[in-house]
Curated annotation (Swiss-Prot):
Cofactor: [4Fe-4S] cluster
Active-site residues, as the UniProt record annotates them: 238 (nucleophile)
Protein name in the entry: Adenosine 5'-phosphosulfate reductase
Keywords: Cytoplasm, Iron, Iron-sulfur, Metal-binding, Oxidoreductase
Gene name of this polypeptide: cysH
Record-linked Pfam families: PAPS_reduct
EC number: 1.8.4.10
Length: 254
């Protein structure tokens, strides 16, 4: 049984801004179990103004299964970059069927932007940041625009850059929620096994973090899960989890 909720508006004065609200939420609810965080956020804090963002990658099944336990109609945003592995697209469809998710929102890059910025489809070979901007960051800004908050499946163990990841964090005027932030690899594996959740088939081939096929490769023993992303480049995040998304939201006046 969840404790009596504390209204979101009472967490930090209006002048404190969204960052203070996120910090307040993290202090109040960040210690809860992931399912409780999802339930509290979806049913009490943000109601119909919250979504989930999923890559349907290596670790996606757990968060989506938990969301389905709470509300199968909750919007799930999927960025169709045009560069996904076929296995990922098949996995997406399989999980949607497994969990009975009914509100998958597929967001794609704008055709005009691709024609202007990446007309040959080879931008990833010369400028990975620009490629991620047009195929991920800007589309996600459009996808989350109608919502006040969204869930992600990010975890601290995935990379050194995520070691201090909070459960609740501010992104411009919105709040991003990472219910699984404090989970370990064992927590992930135990949940997958306990609920007989299927894996992305690429995991069996050493892909422990899965993005677009041109910029993803198997992880070597001893490396962190995201070391196979943009290998050979000084890059560990696509931008949707960094300041790039906040800039895109601001630029779009959302």
């Amino acid at each position: 049984m969840l404790a009596k909720p504390r209204p979101l508006d009472h967490i930090g004065d209006a002048d404190d801004g969204v960052a203070a609200k996120a910090a307040g939420l993290d202090a109040l609810y960040g210690h809860l179990k992931p399912l409780e965080i999802i339930e509290r956020s979806a049913r009490e804090l943000f109601h119909d103004e919250i979504a989930a963002v999923s890559s349907f990658g290596a670790d996606s099944a757990v968060l989506l299964h938990m969301i389905a336990e709470i509300d199968r109609t909750l919007p799930v945003i999927f960025l169709d970059t045009g560069k996904h592995f076929e296995e990922t697209l098949g996995y997406r469809d399989a999980l949607v069927a497994d969990f009975g998710l009914t509100n998958i929102q597929v967001i794609k890059p704008e055709e005009a932007a691709l024609a202007r910025i990446d007309p040959t489809g080879n931008l990833h070979q010369s400028n990975t940041d620009a490629c991620c901007d047009v195929r991920k960051v800007e589309p996600l800004a459009r996808g989350v625009a109608p919502f006040r908050a969204w869930f992600t499946g990010r975890k601290r163990f995935q990379a050194s850059t995520r070691a201090a990841l909070p459960v609740f964090e501010a992104v411009g005027a919105r709040i991003r929620i990472n219910p699984l932030a404090h989970w370990t690899t064992s927590d992930q594996a135990d949940y997958m096994r306990a609920h007989a959740l299927r894996e992305n088939p690429l995991v069996a081939y050493g892909y422990l973090s899965i993005g677009c096929f041109p910029c993803t490769q198997p992880v070597q023993p001893g490396e962190d899960a995201r070391s196979g992303r943009w290998a050979g480049h000084a890059k560990t995040e696509c931008g949707i989890h960094l300041s790039g998304l906040e800039v895109s939201l601001t630029d779009a006046s959302l």
